[in-house]
């Protein structure tokens, strides 16, 4: 098995896959100091598609599980499938559900999926005109991939103008901000529901809540996620079934109608409003840090599940089995994140975990026998 990526999500995936009785050798490309404890790290970048293909062929790898969104959006699954290699993760046409927020809105609108009202702009002047008549607060989103940081909630017109100029003029998110969505601000509790699908069968995982702002009390800039917990009280069975029927199934059906067979995980970022669940965003991969709190409670064989998704046989599996426990995860980040941060600090205490505690590595690397920081989010 090959896991593509280097974050805490990939450490959690490699850790869980390694528990499967059907797992042979597990490789992680490029991996981190944590994945090295449960798998073999290989220094191949997530964007080096030919390097990954060679790795798969050299080691006779039977399944590739892709962690991050960038390689999926750039067609890694397409590349591997074209060479006959099974992959867990959608083709680029399906990954557009995350890589183009405007396309995701189009898909939702076509099926009347509940979501915030939004307008799309590729002209700064038109966007600036719009914000002067819009209700506050409003949400400005970069259309493309921005590592979870391309969403800004603006409480004043000045802040909205500054955000638009930063995204569209100064290109703070590169080409991701060439087009922006300006969306109504929805109030309610946010919930993530990750759903496995092989294009025919869909199976929800445990719901989770993640916390995006970097500071205590939900303050400061948005990040990829600073912590998460499973089984939020409001996301009961009725809530999950409503999300599946009103949101997940219609979106997958609309994509299928456009010729896109979606195989992998569809992450629905939801908000529980007074009118019911609405979509904030979709992602084409496992949430980080959500999957770090979900996988420790999964009692079924993750490798068997991923193989079934990749082969279109998810409907043949027995129902997923879960521990009745709950789990909480906290992200430890480098000072300065999500802006510029320092790296190279020695990490201590990794072996001093409380009973039942786990640590998944993200931005870490080995220097001799020491583990040092090498990224913004360091540990979960």
Language-model-derived ranges and their functions:
Residues 356-380:
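Internal helix-turn-beta structural module
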Residues 244-266, 283-354, 362-367:
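Active-site "cap" helix and flanking loop/linker of ATP-utilizing ligase/carboxylase catalytic domains
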Residues 41-48, 119-123, 154:
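Short acidic-hydrophobic, aromatic-tinged amphipathic segments that line or gate anion-handling sites
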Residues 150-292:
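Internal nucleotide-binding/catalytic subdomain
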